[in-house]
Amino acid sequence: MLFTLKKGELFGRLIAIGRVIVGIYAFLAALCFMSMVITGTAAFDALCLSLSGVATGGLTPQSAPISAYVGRVSSVILAIFCFFGAMNIAIIWDALRLRRWRNIYALIRNVEHRGLLAIAMFISIFGFFFVGFSQAFTIIIESLYFVSSAGFDYNVIGIELLPPVILIAIALVGGSALSTSGGVKIIRVLLLFRHLNTDMSRLSHPSRVVPVSFKKQHIPDRAFLSIWMYFFGYTLFFAFSIMALGATGFTFEDAVATGAASLSNIGPLLPATLPESGLTYADFSPVQKLISAMFMLIGRVEVLAVLVLFTPSFWAR
């Protein structure tokens, strides 16, 4: 186990893991960059978008929508690599290292990746009812950008026409574990639903022994305790963000949208959920920017590690 290694072995293992992660993301970013340049995107724009897309950061070299300076083919390429950024990096590493069909097929067969595709399809199909099939390409592309938590804005008319509650819920769920995407992560949500289903079965049959299994593996109760603690911590920080932003003068709707955008690290979620208010980050006061940045950092690191800082036992000698 990693935490039972000696100090020298621990740092050696961390360096080895770091090299693998850097190598994978450098390879994907370089491949995305070359593909976008070949399909007609300017080199500087392609460089910025490829680095931001694979890292699901959502930063763009221009303030205009992506459709204003990137062609359709390049937009599809960027969406694909954003989706790679939201995938489990361990499974990507196995596929690249072993280079066997069954390992490549595992990228698609993985339950988290199928969940990402299902969410993207849900956004696309749901979006057709609001914007029509004339904007089908925009909805499909923006759904891939959104589920990866990159959140690029492809066109002026897109997913911002969808109900804000749906967008916020999807943003808080996030992407795959061991990925650069934000949110609670799909695997945790799936396990929580599996555990909830088992508990409901125990209510109807109290004496029945119902072990919880996932992907043919038994999941111990202590694992679910950690997941529930993470979910509680994430929900708690979301509530804190709403209260903190509300105390600065935000309306409840503005505070919820900003808190969700900050914790999930999807900046464009704010204008997407509040298009009629016209609220942007440029309108924030210094205090509001500081609060938003703080919860962005909390959403990017391990929530439980931050939550421990607020316990008296951590500061006790």
Please report, for each region that a protein language model flagged, where it lies by residue.
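Membrane-proximal intracellular helices of multi-pass ion channels
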Residues: 1-317
